[in-house]
Amino acid sequence: MHKVELFIPCFIDQLYPETAFNTIKLLEKAGCDVIYNTEQTCCGQPAYNAGFWDDAKSIGQKFLNDFTEEHPIVSPSASCTGMVREGYDDLFTNTTDHNRCRGIQRNIFEISDFLVNVMKKEYFGAELVGRAVYHDS
């Protein structure tokens, strides 16, 4: 079984909790053992986007402490994954957290990226009858 750490962003936690539960179901169906740290909160993107970089950095430091480099970190949010992969460069480059940040950045995946490119899964027996939207972050 493939162990993964699950990051549920603050907006999903508060507004779309079913998405969190469905993410767990999907990862388990793909053969993952899901680890969920109940102390996690946010990636810091709302503060970062609003220009409050000191606050975003504090939240980001908590994020770096809440997750490990031992297992892939999987999130159902492309924008939060993008924040960690790209935005954290603005917050942590040339700091004492720089190396740890780089390790986390290499280890975080949006769920579809993880399933297709890491787990090599492309079919789950489901079919969508309707429209879908793709958000490239």
Q: Which residues does each predicted region cover?
A:
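Iron-sulfur cluster-binding electron-transfer modules in prokaryotic oxidoreductases
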Residues: 1-137
